[in-house]
């Protein structure tokens, strides 16, 4: 694939930076491929001597590529730059976000988080499709009674509603749907 060809160019002792054309193309291609595969997350993880790219599809992580460390580090820097994160800081977790478009031209938001590991910086990108975010409460699994209770809680003039749950459980989707 073109991704493998782009990564091939990245082999050898050459150093890359976040604005290198090859790196820009690799990141763009990776995102488009993730959208095509209907991935919900993209993981870029350092190992002892190479980088691993994994996609979460239907809740399961699949290894997609192995890439040279120099390419992986430059990709991570490129994505951090786009997410307005501190590119230099690699020893502390960071969060950011990037808006981009699918091949069909629809806007998608990526939530970024980095985490230091023994072998370098791990980057996880969660893909948010605004089309998927706005649904109705019934399609989110709310019973009729729950819908009524939720409506009452979220339209009260004062108070606080705390929405918690594990990653991917639908917190953001529930809140977007409520605001709609």
Where are these regions (language model features)?
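N-terminal "pre-motor" subdomain/linker immediately upstream of P-loop NTPase catalytic cores
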Residues: 1-166
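Conserved glycine(s) of the Walker
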Residues: 170
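Hydrophobic positions on the alpha1 helix immediately C-terminal to the Walker A/P-loop
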Residues: 174-178
């Amino acid at each position: 694939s073109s991704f493998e060809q782009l990564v091939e160019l990245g082999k050898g002792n050459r150093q890359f930076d976040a604005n290198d054309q090859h790196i820009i193309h690799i990141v763009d291609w990776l995102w488009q491929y993730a959208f095509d595969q209907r991935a919900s997350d993209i993981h870029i993880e350092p190992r002892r001597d190479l980088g691993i790219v994994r996609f979460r599809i239907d809740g399961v992580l699949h290894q997609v590529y192995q890439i040279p460390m120099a390419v992986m580090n430059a990709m991570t820097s490129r994505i951090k730059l786009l997410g307005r994160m501190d590119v230099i800081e690699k020893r502390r977790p960071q969060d950011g976000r990037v808006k981009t478009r699918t091949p069909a031209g629809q806007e998608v938001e990526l939530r970024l988080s980095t985490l230091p590991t023994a072998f370098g910086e791990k980057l996880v990108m969660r893909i948010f499709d605004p089309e998927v975010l706005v649904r109705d409460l019934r399609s989110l699994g709310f019973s009729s009674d729950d819908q009524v209770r939720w409506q009452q809680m979220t339209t009260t003039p004062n108070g606080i509603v705390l929405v918690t749950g594990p990653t991917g459980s639908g917190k953001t989707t529930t809140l977007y749907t409520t605001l709609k």
